Design a protein with these regions (language model features):
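An acidic, low-aromatic, low-complexity terminal/linker signal
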Residues: 1-146
Length: 146
């Protein structure tokens, strides 16, 4: 599975490339978890605020595909954009190394947005990778807004 990695404290957030339309530099200041732009109808989700890393500044915007066969991915209107810390790496991780999230974490609401976990004990800095499922993230946030 090819993913982009962004650092959050002591873990990497892994975002599968299959969900991504494109990436942009982000220099704005977001102080809300979710913001909707009424001009272009884009929805911005601040992952540092969502994950309670308010000291982290979003450096990139990850523009999600509207669906897997999205023909208009070059147009940045009516999109969901994940604001994230700097994307540090793009790597390929064999799917057989990724474990499903432990059931005990189901009690923690935020853990439901992750599709898997990987531990790399040989890494000195960040040895845990959490794999984001953007579809579940968006569904959960839409429920909050209703």
């Amino acid at each position: 599975m090819r993913v982009f990695l962004s650092a959050y404290g002591n873990f990497y957030l892994a975002i599968p490339i299959t969900y991504i339309s494109s990436i942009m530099l982000y220099s704005g200041n977001s102080d809300k978890k979710i913001e909707h732009n009424s001009e272009n109808h884009n929805t911005y989700i601040s992952l540092p605020i969502l994950f309670d890393y308010t000291g982290e500044t979003p450096r990139h915007g990850i523009i999600l595909r509207n669906n897997m066969n999205d023909e208009n991915n070059g147009i940045i209107k009516n999109k969901t954009i994940l604001l994230t810390t700097e994307i540090e790496h793009e790597i390929n991780i064999p799917e057989e190394r990724i474990y499903s999230m432990p059931k005990i974490l189901d009690k923690i609401k935020i853990s439901r947005v992750f599709s898997g976990i990987l531990f790399e004990p040989d890494r000195q800095d960040k040895n845990m990778f959490l794999f984001l499922n953007p579809e579940v993230l968006i569904q959960n946030l839409q429920k909050e807004l209703e």
